[in-house]
């Protein structure tokens, strides 16, 4: 598959964000929900709906959601590329695809993780309330629109502090149902969470409880687009579409992910405040027990305050990106091969 430049991605995102309706042979941009704001403005959540030319209404349906956090931009490129490829080959579409590129448009406009002014994480208000405040109302309408999908993929980037390798995260309560999809998602890593740690007000938790199988993907770092990670996930999405009978294109080559449970993941935290300097450069991946992950240094007295050492043979799949750290800051996650 060919991938255009980020400039094309931004141009496409601008069109999707501000156009109200666009109809051609296979796609239609619909307004999912709108809420009036002060000074004659309003929040509008849009989706791009695709179906085959001779749809019967019995086709499998995939929903692709991103932009819940306004500082997560990888999903914008992913949406662009999925839309571009479907529009380039509508004859290969045999099912329904709904693309929701921006659930938190206020946050996206400001580059803020949550909803500006309200200091609210959009991913803590699902499944929402049709009679609730603005965020709850929007969340409820989005959930209602997604219900009926055969599968939902909720695409996230990390925040501006931690870089994540492409991964799928699952609640162990839903693992049996979701693992077959997670394994063909072209991720480096599949992390199965304990149900004790699950935040119940997330989109994924709510949809899974409502009967819509939902995968959560994480990759990259906030306010950036990692082309390689996006392309990896895009191949995974088309692989899923082929598996669901939604797409008749050539099946992409996907990697076999590393499978994990929470007990196999080591969390490495800082013991000192200072600057974290990675010894891994831009690369995460395999590491041996005792190898350096990085150092915490003091720019005042020129000393290494803490050497960050891998506690086990394994895979580094999360790594501190912002170098300014404090005692207790998460520096890395290592999947330990025991």
Which positions does each model-derived feature cover?
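Structured catalytic-domain cores with a bias toward divalent-metal coordination
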Residues: 2-338
């Amino acid at each position: 598959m060919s991938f255009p430049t980020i400039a094309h991605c931004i141009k496409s995102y601008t069109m999707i964000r501000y156009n109200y309706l666009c109809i051609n042979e296979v796609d239609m941009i619909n307004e999912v929900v709108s809420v009036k704001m002060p000074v004659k403005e309003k929040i509008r959540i849009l989706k791009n709906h695709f179906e085959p030319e001779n749809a019967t209404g019995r086709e499998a349906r995939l929903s692709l959601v991103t932009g819940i956090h306004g500082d997560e931009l990888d999903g914008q490129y992913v949406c662009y590329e999925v839309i571009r490829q479907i529009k380039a080959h509508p004859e290969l579409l045999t099912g329904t695809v709904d693309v929701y590129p921006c659930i938190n448009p206020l946050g996206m406009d400001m580059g803020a993780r949550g909803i500006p002014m309200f200091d609210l994480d959009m991913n803590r208000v699902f499944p929402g309330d049709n009679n609730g405040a603005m965020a709850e109302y929007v969340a409820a309408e989005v959930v209602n629109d997604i219900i009926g999908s055969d599968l939902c993929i909720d695409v996230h980037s990390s925040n501006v502090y931690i870089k994540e390798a492409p991964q799928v995260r699952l609640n162990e309560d839903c693992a049996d149902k979701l693992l077959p999809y997670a394994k063909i998602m072209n991720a480096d890593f599949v992390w199965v969470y304990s149900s004790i740690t699950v935040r119940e007000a997330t989109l994924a938790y709510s949809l899974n409880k409502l009967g819509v199988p939902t995968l959560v993907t994480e990759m990259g770092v906030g306010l950036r687009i990692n082309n390689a990670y996006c392309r990896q996930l895009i191949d995974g999405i088309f692989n899923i579409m082929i598996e669901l009978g939604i797409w008749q294109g050539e099946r992409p080559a996907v990697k076999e992910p590393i499978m994990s449970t929470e007990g196999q993941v080591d969390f490495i935290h800082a013991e000192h405040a200072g600057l974290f300097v990675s010894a891994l450069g831009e690369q995460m991946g395999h590491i041996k027990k005792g190898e350096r992950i990085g150092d915490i240094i003091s720019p005042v007295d020129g000393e290494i305050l803490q050497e960050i050492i891998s506690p086990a043979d394994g895979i580094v799949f999360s790594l501190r990106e912002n170098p300014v750290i404090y005692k207790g800051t998460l520096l890395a996650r290592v999947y330990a091969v025991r």
